[in-house]
Amino acid sequence: MKKKHVAVLMGGFSSERPVSLSSGNSCADALEAEGYRVSRVDVSRDVSRVLSELKPDVAFNALHGPFGEDGTVQGVLEYLGIPYTHSGVLASALAMDKDLAKTVAKSAGIPVASSRVMNRFEIGDKHPMEPPYVVKPVAEGSSFGVVIVREGQSHPPQVLGSAEWGYGERVMVERYIPGRELTCAVMGDRVLGVCEIVPVGHSFYDYDSKYAPGGSRHVCPAEISPNIYQKIERLALKAHQAIGCRGVSRSDFRYDDRLPGEEGIVWLEINTQPGMTPTSLVPDIAAQAGIGFGALLSWMVEDASCPR
């Protein structure tokens, strides 16, 4: 049977462009190895014209950040009638807004950290909540703009009010959750497993930890009790379903193992466009579940649809 023509969308114009190019080229190489006819599309503002001319059978969305994972390009693909991978317009927009995604997760009974959304200029010189807390852009990924305010710091970081800040006006101020960094991948209605992320030389899972070779160590499967492991799997699937995700998603958690039972589990966010670089988590978790990179991507292509 003739393999499909797949347009791999990558690059774009968000702050996550380099990550997207890495993801996109990794995916394109693997899909070509699987026998698909692949067109690599470095996305610009005329992407609708480019896709109209290419006429692909499927658009594989390897974009990250605004435009690529906030429902915008998904809307373009729906308008053009091109089947595409990952989540649809509504789920993508919802998951991209960390505050709205937390609201939905909480309503579904998923434990989340207390937080509030503010304009960054409101923060000024006074702590918006008792340290320790985390300040993060409401709609960015790859840990761009994440600032941890520790106990003992006399005032919030000055960068929040400076011209150097390039991550939008709305920020989420969230209670800092100590403990272990865990993540869980979901593929359709199947949970693939839980992985622990151990940053190497960094205090938390920041941009360098995520994408620099050797920046972090992935312990897959996570070395936690079976009860906690299974609970995190159930919560990740519940978040995937509550937000309306399709294809592959990845939920991030903190787990404070000093607390009794399941009390230390806190859901942080869901990623509807998880990275697919050589150092990314979802390919590692899938491999532990017996699914190779090429097989994972082939499943995503065959799962593509329009509408989503």
From Swiss-Prot:
Residue ranges occupied by any ATP-grasp domain in the UniProt entry: 102-302
EC number: 6.3.2.4
Protein residues bound to ATP: 128-183
Matching PROSITE patterns: ATP_GRASP, DALA_DALA_LIGASE_1, DALA_DALA_LIGASE_2
Cofactor info, note text: Binds 2 magnesium or manganese ions per subunit.
Pfam families from the UniProt entry: Dala_Dala_lig_C, Dala_Dala_lig_N
Catalytic activity line of the entry: 2 D-alanine + ATP = D-alanyl-D-alanine + ADP + phosphate + H(+)
A GO cellular component annotation in the UniProt record: cytoplasm
Binding site for Mg(2+) 2: E269, N271
Swiss-Prot/TrEMBL keywords: ATP-binding, Cell shape, Cell wall biogenesis/degradation, Cytoplasm, Ligase, Magnesium, Manganese, Metal-binding, Nucleotide-binding, Peptidoglycan synthesis
A GO term for molecular function: D-alanine-D-alanine ligase activity
Localisation per UniProt entry: Cytoplasm
Organism domain of life: Bacteria
Enzyme class label: ligase
Pathway(s) it belongs to: Cell wall biogenesis; peptidoglycan biosynthesis
Family to which the UniProt record says this protein belongs: Belongs to the D-alanine--D-alanine ligase family.
NCBIfam families registered for this protein in UniProt: D_ala_D_alaTIGR, PRK01372.1
Function comment: Cell wall formation.
Protein's recorded name: D-alanine--D-alanine ligase
